[in-house]
């Protein structure tokens, strides 16, 4: 089975009494005879542990993403002096490093500083998005993540990058999630 979007892939960690819907879906697929599952940029590839005796492959669409970016954005220049790849949080850092290495440009990241003295809607609220990386002033930046839920963090990150005088700013979830 080729699944461009892995069903319930954000449901990869168990909190309280939640089910592991992604793991259950993979197990159900193998129960009906599926031996091989291919997906694109799984949110957490460790979900393959739910089906240890079956084939599970997560394909990184990095080349296709960079090719589409260069084809559709004529003003972009993938040179270290002109561009950076930015991770919006710690969870996307591996993906950003991979993209940065493939594109041959620097990488930066944000971390979410949280107030651990409060809980709002079941989470500790984010106080600020702190940037770690080289100066983005005058550079085109691509903020890359695998999924966007509400978009609130992405807006905060984009706002901070513009405050730091980044030029052209592109935000994108993985190509399989961009709709």
Predicted features, each with a name:
Residues 9-18, 53, 57-70, 74-81, ...:
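Short, glycine/charge-rich flexible loops or terminal/linker lids adjacent to PRPP-binding catalytic cores
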Residues 2, 39, 87, 143-144:
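Generic enzyme active-site microenvironment
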Residues 2-54:
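RNA-binding accessory domains that recognize and position tRNA/RNA substrates
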Residues 170-173, 177-179:
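Single conserved hydrophobic/aromatic residue that forms the stacking wall/gate
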Residues 34-36, 82-85, 169:
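Short active-site oxyanion
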Residues 155-165:
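Basic, amphipathic juxtamembrane/active-site segments
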């Amino acid at each position: 089975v080729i699944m461009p979007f892995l069903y319930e892939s954000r449901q990869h960690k168990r909190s309280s009494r939640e089910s592991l819907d992604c793991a259950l879906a993979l197990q159900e697929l193998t129960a009906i005879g599926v031996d091989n599952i291919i997906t694109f940029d799984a949110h957490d590839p460790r979900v393959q542990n739910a089906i240890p005796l079956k084939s599970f492959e997560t394909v990184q669409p990095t080349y296709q993403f960079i090719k589409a970016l260069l084809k559709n954005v004529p003003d972009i220049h993938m040179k270290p002096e002109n561009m950076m790849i930015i991770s919006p949080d710690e969870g996307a850092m591996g993906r950003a490093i991979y993209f940065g290495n493939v594109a041959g440009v620097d990488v930066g990241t944000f971390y979410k500083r949280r107030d651990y003295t409060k809980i709002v809607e079941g989470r500790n609220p984010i106080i600020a998005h702190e940037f770690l990386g080289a100066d983005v002033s005058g550079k085109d930046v691509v903020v890359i993540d695998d999924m966007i839920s509400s978009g609130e963090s992405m807006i905060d990150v984009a706002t901070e990058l513009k405050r730091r005088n980044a030029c052209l700013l592109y935000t994108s979830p993985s190509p399989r999630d961009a709709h």
